[in-house]
Amino acid sequence: MTAAAVLAGHEGPAAAVSVPLLVKRLGRVDYAPAWEAMQHFTASRGEDTADEIWLLEHPPVYTLGQAGRPEHLLRNDAGIPLVKIDRGGQITYHGPGQLVAYLLLDLRRRHLKVRELVALMEQAVIDCLAEYGLHAERKDGAPGVYIDGAKIAALGLRVRNGCSYHGLALNVDADLAPFGWINPCGYEGLQTIRLKDFGVGDDVAAVGERLLQHLLRLLPPGVVPSR
């Protein structure tokens, strides 16, 4: 799928907020065109461009954020691609069975600071997992969502001209072996887990719809600047 195809996507209905928000359910998309599409969307948006949330999966890929160090890739027996990208954070893995939600938002219109958006994304995941009877929590100084100290969701953002892109990744039924070949998010020995480990049978699409409702509930409304 090309970057242009990602941008076309499948648009859902606008959310019931003052600032228009479109939801795109993209299925499985290669990382590079998705990243290119996020950059293009953010660079070309205007004051009245609708915000968007993209729900998708990626084929196996490691991404290395701006704070990442190549030595955190310990081994790569499977030949998984490594892509150096512009989000915050360090190294992580994306692959089938992992829900990815990209939040392309004008933070100024929604009166959101970056740290507030991070906390909002974490809370949306925590509330989503609570629907499955799971108690998840934050960890000071280590963005993401954890259950008993093991990481189930990773976060990373880039903000350009007051607008965010990238977002979060939640392990649903992903193969966790590739996490064992890195120091996830730069932390040696950090355990990663998935919803499947707790008997959750929902697939990525079903979990995505639950998470989406919590994101929409928590996002503050905003106003498109009048002309």
Swiss-Prot record:
Annotated positions binding substrate: R87, G88, G89, Q90, I91, T92, Y93, H94, A154, L155, G156, G167, L168, A169
Residue ranges constituting the BPL/LPL catalytic domain according to the UniProt record: 47-223
* Catalytic reactions on record: octanoyl-[ACP] + L-lysyl-[protein] = N(6)-octanoyl-L-lysyl-[protein] + holo-[ACP] + H(+)
Can you list the disulfide-bonded cysteine pairs? Answer: none
Question: Which locations, inside or outside the cell, does it occupy?
Answer: Cytoplasm
Mind listing the UniProt keywords for this protein, alphabetically? Acyltransferase, Cytoplasm, Transferase
Which CDD domains does the entry mention?
LipB
What is an annotated GO biological process for this record, any one?
Answer: protein modification process
Enzyme class (EC, first level): transferase
Q: What is its main location?
A: cytoplasm
**InterPro entries documented for this protein:** aa-tRNA-synth_II/BPL/LPL (IPR045864), BPL_LPL_catalytic (IPR004143), Octanoyltransferase (IPR000544), Octanoyltransferase_CS (IPR020605)
**Miscellaneous field:** In the reaction, the free carboxyl group of octanoic acid is attached via an amide linkage to the epsilon-amino group of a specific lysine residue of lipoyl domains of lipoate-dependent enzymes.
The record describes the protein's role as: Catalyzes the transfer of endogenously produced octanoic acid from octanoyl-acyl-carrier-protein onto the lipoyl domains of lipoate-dependent enzymes. Lipoyl-ACP can also act as a substrate although octanoyl-ACP is likely to be the physiological substrate.
Q: Which HAMAP family match?
A: LipB
Query: Which PANTHER family does this one have?
Result: LIPOYLTRANSFERASE 2, MITOCHONDRIAL-RELATED, OCTANOYLTRANSFERASE
Protein name (Swiss-Prot/TrEMBL): Octanoyltransferase
Native organism: Azoarcus sp. (strain BH72)
